[in-house]
Amino acid sequence: MEQTTEKKQGTADRERAKEKKALYFIGILGGFFFVFLGIEYIFDNRMALVTDSEGVVAAQGCILGISAAGFLAYGLLRHYLKEKTVHYLLGISGIVSVGLLLGLFGNLSWSWMLLLGVLLFFLLGVLGAAAHDICARLQQGSTALGRMAGAAYAIGILLQFSNHSVSGNEWIEAVVLAGMIFLFGGMAAGAKRMLPETRGEDTGAASDSADHSGKNSVEDRREEQKASRRKVTLMIVIVCLMTCIFSMLDNAVTMAHVSGQADIGQWPRLFLGGSGLLAGLL
């Protein structure tokens, strides 16, 4: 009887831990999507004050490109620096990002606005990579990864729509976004406490088990490595193609927004949230 009770308690604890990880995953990624898209919207509007629509699109291309560089830079930081050092750098990046965001509201020229945007989005790329890294490790092996990612994207879009529709003032929107940077950063720090303390801990255990079962021969490992490389290569190609398509469409929509033909912060933005949910279900 006691064993049955303990078993049920253990199952309940695991379910609660699983639900907690799922909430952290959605909260962290949803918060990042909200911050990134919201700041991009503000940057476009601020840049439109000092240049024409073509200049805004060109500047947007620069900041999005540099955010990708920041995304890649995070991998180098994790590879060459200690975990605690990376943790401190991420905290500093969040604080500096808030300062740069508020700096966009100064009386700036096109070149200074672009410089602030480049610095800001490089740091956002680093923070975004950290958010994705933590979430991926948090849900390693989960079969619901796609659904949770879709839900996180939809929540991020909904938050941006609500922030823009309710506040009606860019300063207020910026303050809300600044608060969200600290909030999702705090959630990321909390989520890291749920991760294994040492990298490769689970991998090492899996390798030992495979060695004992006789399935981890040299040939098996080579085949697994080849299969992994093919999967990674295919994933990179797909992501690159989708990013290229999305960025081209984004440029076209931004051109219409800056020229006054439409406000992309209003209800059409909700289509993105719906597409994210649908992609997660598929």
Roles of regions detected by a PLM:
Residues 13-48, 52-56, 228-250:
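Pair of pore-lining "gating" transmembrane helices in MFS-fold secondary transporters
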Residues 93-107:
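C-terminal ends and interior cores of transmembrane alpha-helices
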Residues 141-164:
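Glycine-rich segments within core transmembrane alpha-helices of 12-TM secondary carriers
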Residues 57-78, 274-279:
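Central cavity-lining transmembrane alpha-helices of secondary-active solute carriers
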Residues 125-139:
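Intracellular juxtamembrane helix-capping segments at the cytosolic ends
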Residues 111-127:
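Hydrophobic core of transmembrane alpha-helices in multi-pass small-molecule transporters
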Residues 50-63, 257-275:
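Loop-to-transmembrane helix entry
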Residues 173-190:
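Symmetry-related core transmembrane helices of the 12-TM Major Facilitator Superfamily/SLC fold
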